[in-house]
């Protein structure tokens, strides 16, 4: 029988706010796509993510042949202003997360407030350093803004 030393429970909170020159509907649709088919690493590698966009729906990485990774469940969804996910996300260790995307219209722009809170036996490199969760979410929020603004411009401001 193996016994290990006590591990430290850590928590973190990532908060990102972004003003996006696109309608709230376009931004919400873009978030759903970014979490699903357009989810990729900064080097452009697809993560093959699937999002079932309804209460209780799964968010998971589909590697085919009944293989993959469960990331979370849709805890709340109120199109086009709220998407909330709970689950372990990318963490393959004892941890739980809550992720919120909240959208509000402000003066012709959409304000995206993104929050990721987590707690568990989280290694310090997840919280700090080059490959931290903060850097990963910064990339994703930036991609949402770029894609939503590109869609808004391509649609001629419709929606």
What are these regions (language model features)?
Residues 16-18, 101, 114-116:
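A structural signal for short, well-ordered beta-strand segments
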Residues 118-159:
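A conserved amphipathic terminal alpha-helix motif
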